[in-house]
A protein has these predicted regions:
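N-terminal signal-anchor/start-transfer transmembrane helix
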Residues: 5-30
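Membrane-water interface at the C-terminal end of transmembrane alpha helices
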Residues: 18-22, 85, 89-90, 105-114
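Small-residue-rich segments of transmembrane alpha-helices in multi-pass membrane proteins
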Residues: 40-48, 99-114
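Membrane-helix boundary connector in multi-pass membrane proteins
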Residues: 63-64, 71, 82-96, 114
Length: 114
């Protein structure tokens, strides 16, 4: 269980880091030359949702176990499924792989904390 909690913590921190990069430097993740105003807007919109969810996914399984922690981790996993689907739609293989890995880690931790 400790290894799974550590993996979940790393996954949550990675998700937070990518959200912060997406908010601060959206072109770094979208690989566009100069981000448009809309791209910057959506980068910040993504970060304002992903950072709190990532922090909650990091803290919840460490603070308590049970249905509440499992539900929160399931929500984090669902968000990563969405990110993976966006990766599939845009053929961004690193996004597919990263989001799929984070989905698996959050899901496994959710099952283990019930």
């Amino acid at each position: 269980m400790n290894a799974l909690l550590a993996a979940n913590a790393v996954a949550a921190v990675a998700g937070i880091a990518f959200a912060l990069v997406g908010g601060a430097r959206p072109a770094a993740l979208s690989e566009s030359g100069t981000p448009s105003a809309g791209e910057r807007f959506y980068g910040w919109m993504y970060a304002t949702r992903a950072v709190p969810l990532g922090v909650a996914a990091l803290i919840a399984p460490l603070a308590w176990s049970g249905p509440a922690s499992s539900l929160l981790l399931s929500a984090a996993a669902a968000a990563q499924v969405g990110d993976a689907a966006i990766g599939v739609a845009t053929r961004t293989w690193t996004m597919i792989a990263g989001a799929s890995l984070l989905t698996a880690v959050h899901t496994a931790t959710a099952v283990a904390t019930v």
